[in-house]
Swiss-Prot record:
Keywords: Amino-acid biosynthesis, Cytoplasm, Histidine biosynthesis, Isomerase
Pfam families with a match to the protein in the record: His_biosynth
Gene that encodes it: hisA
UniProt entry tagged with the keyword Lipid metabolism: no
Organism: Lachnoclostridium phytofermentans (strain ATCC 700394 / DSM 18823 / ISDg) (Clostridium phytofermentans)
Keyword Nucleotide-binding: no
EC number: 5.3.1.16
Single GO BP term: L-tryptophan biosynthetic process
Active site residues according to the UniProt entry: 8, 130
The protein, known as: 1-(5-phosphoribosyl)-5-[(5-phosphoribosylamino)methylideneamino] imidazole-4-carboxamide isomerase
Length: 239
């Protein structure tokens, strides 16, 4: 099980939101690249970046910061937030990012997913499914759709997708533990590589997720608040 330390970027800074609320922000660092270096130093084998401004604006906003992170660390990086066009994807990959996460666009236009998988390959494209009580949320979490998350994942699988970041937004940034039940459903019913995200607060949460066979876990606030020591966690779960 791979652990992905999360770096959320807003106005060029490393921040955390509570439950995806853009007005509820905590700033952790003015230099996100330093944070990336810190996580790499503690054993991170992959880093997860979200351009929060991008997610809201619908186009890339913090590319300079992302580029700086890519140039600072040697581990691979995945990026999400505001990536909606083929040009966006090309641009991100040209910055040196290893793979991109597509969210809203996948819900709105499955044909686009098919196209980008055939253009870039399934290893470069991750689909982000954000859900609230099993239903898909879109547009930077501002709207909840009438799409069931598992159905959407299965539809993506048909299109050639192999990896999904599954976020339960009722849990995100709240440190209340992940939604094991819905995540397990995702793993069992889709057979895809599921990267769990949202609510991870302790080593116990990581054990629970490891048991249900997720392929990875994104850890945010719990790392910043030292509830999980990345070095220990990596040693336990990535070996």
């Amino acid at each position: 099980m791979r652990l992905y330390p999360a770096i959320d970027i807003r106005n060029g800074q490393c921040v955390r939101l509570r439950q995806g609320q853009f007005h509820d922000v905590e700033v952790y660092s003015h230099v996100p690249a330093n944070i990336a270096m810190q996580w790499e130093g503690q054993g991170a084998s992959y880093i997860h970046i979200v351009d929060l401004d991008g997610a809201l604006a619908g186009h890339s906003v913090n590319d300079e910061v992302i580029k700086e992170i890519v140039q600072t660390v040697s581990v691979p990086i995945q990026v999400g937030g505001g990536i909606r066009t083929i040009q966006d994807i090309e641009h991100k990959l040209n910055l040196g990012v290893n793979r991109v996460i597509i969210g809203t666009k996948a819900v709105e236009n499955p044909q686009f997913v098919k196209e980008i998988i055939s253009t870039f390959g399934a290893d470069k494209i991750v689909i982000g499914i954000d859900a609230k009580n099993g239903m898909v949320a879109i547009e930077g979490w501002e709207k909840v759709s009438n799409y069931n998350a598992v159905s959407l994942a299965l539809e993506m699988k048909e299109l050639g997708v192999s990896t999904i970041v599954y976020t339960d937004i009722s849990k995100d940034g709240m440190l209340q533990g992940p939604n094991i039940e819905h995540t397990k459903e995702m793993v069992d019913l889709t057979g895809l590589n599921i990267i769990a995200s949202g609510g991870v607060s302790s080593m116990k949460d990581l054990e629970e997720l490891d048991k249900i066979k997720v392929s990875g876990v994104i850890i945010g606030k719990a790392l910043y608040e030292r509830r999980i020591e990345l070095e220990n966690a990596t040693r336990l779960f990535e070996q």
